[in-house]
A protein has these predicted regions:
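PLP-dependent amino-acid enzyme catalytic core
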Residues: 1-158
Length: 158
């Protein structure tokens, strides 16, 4: 069964999609500070502001994307659970928000993932599968488990 929210890579992100995501996330993630970057502004000859997403609970910008995806799942998909391949920030963000929403989560990580990342993700409620030597190996295994266990794949960057 295909996921109801599987991204279509041919579609561009629209301002309407951004506004809808902002509405879904309102009050669910921290509103983080923006700071002017003089160095980046000088390097690009443009005014550059940097958003401090490292102030989020898991110290990463990945929280917005992971939570936005989870909030768009159907009740059936939430019950089935989600799976992702990640060796760090996406894993922790997804595990954190999935636990808050009561969604079972499996994270596939490469075998060489630092133990601190594995344990931080496990502490946030995810089932951890260590598979493969590289991220690509872990990613391929996550897709295989998705099919075998009828899970919803949450892509780490799409």
């Amino acid at each position: 069964m295909p996921d109801s929210t599987a991204p279509d890579p041919r579609l561009a992100v629209t301002i309407e999609a951004i506004r809808a995501a902002a509405k879904r996330l309102n009050g669910r993630v921290d509103r983080t500070e923006m700071r002017h970057s003089r160095a980046l502004s000088e390097a690009t000859s443009a005014e550059v502001w940097v958003k401090y997403e490292n102030d989020q609970y898991t110290a990463a910008f990945k929280e917005r994307g992971a939570l936005n995806k989870l909030l768009q799942l159907t009740d059936n998909e939430k019950q089935r659970g989600v799976i992702a391949a990640s060796a760090g920030n996406h894993a922790q963000a997804l595990a954190h928000h999935a636990r808050e929403l009561g969604v079972p989560t499996t994270i596939v990580m490469p075998k060489a993932t630092p133990n601190v990342k594995v344990e931080q993700t496990r502490a946030r409620g995810a089932v951890i599968v260590l598979e493969g030597e590289t991220f690509d190996d872990a990613y391929a295994h996550a897709l295989k488990l998705r099919e075998q266990q009828n899970l919803v794949f949450v892509h780490p960057f799409n």
